[in-house]
């Protein structure tokens, strides 16, 4: 699996991203900028009819109502990362609620360590739920600046698709060339990443 991640990192390093002039966001980032970047996460046939959220003073705020069950926003695994994503309805009922909680806590000044522990406790108590069925998260934009767990550094990452895989690990999907990469392995919000053979910019 490490070889898979290394290959993805090399692919990311070789890309020229038009989005690299903006590689992080916070509550002070203009709403119109956040909306535009959030819409890059998925095809316009989805984002034109999705709920759109922006990061505000107290966490995420719904600024555009949709009708197709998708929710698009700029997620931040860490305050320094930037991950435009569009969750389907299943993700909106489960994983996305955790993401909302995380940003609400950050807005209150809670430490990252405390937030992580609260999320773990929330899953254990049933406050938070893992996805109960298969589904997809779009992350197709050029604005993906993610944490490389191997190095602790933030890298630019190519557009990709993610599929819910609660508690999945390398043993679940196999290892070696061609095997998908698992984000948050063994956790309720684990995701299986698939990078299209010719990942393309989704800038509209």
Residue ranges with predicted function:
Residues 21-204:
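Primary mode marks residue(s) on the alpha4-beta5-alpha5 output face of response regulator receiver
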Residues 9-18:
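Hydrophobic h-region of N-terminal signal peptides that target proteins for export
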Residues 2-8:
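Sec-dependent signal peptide recognition
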């Amino acid at each position: 699996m490490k070889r898979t991640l290394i290959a993805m990192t090399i692919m990311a390093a070789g890309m020229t991203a038009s989005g690299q002039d903006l590689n992080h966001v916070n509550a002070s980032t203009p709403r119109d900028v956040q909306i535009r970047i959030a819409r890059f996460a998925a095809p316009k046939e989805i984002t034109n009819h999705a709920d759109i959220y922006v990061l505000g003073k107290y966490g995420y705020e719904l600024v555009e109502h949709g009708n197709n069950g998708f929710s698009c926003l700029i997620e931040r695994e860490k305050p320094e990362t930037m991950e435009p994503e569009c969750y389907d309805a299943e993700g909106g009922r489960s994983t996305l609620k955790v993401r909302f909680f995380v940003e609400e806590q950050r807005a209150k000044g809670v430490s990252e360590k405390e937030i992580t522990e609260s999320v773990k406790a929330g899953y254990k108590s049933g406050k938070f739920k893992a996805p109960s069925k298969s589904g997809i998260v779009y992350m197709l934009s050029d604005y993906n600046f993610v944490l490389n767990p191997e190095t602790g550094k933030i890298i630019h990452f190519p557009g990709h698709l993610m599929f819910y895989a609660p508690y999945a690990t390398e043993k679940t999907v196999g290892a070696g060339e061609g095997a998908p990469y698992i984000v948050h392995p063994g956790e309720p919000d684990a995701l299986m990443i698939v990078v299209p053979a010719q990942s393309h910019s989704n800038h509209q």
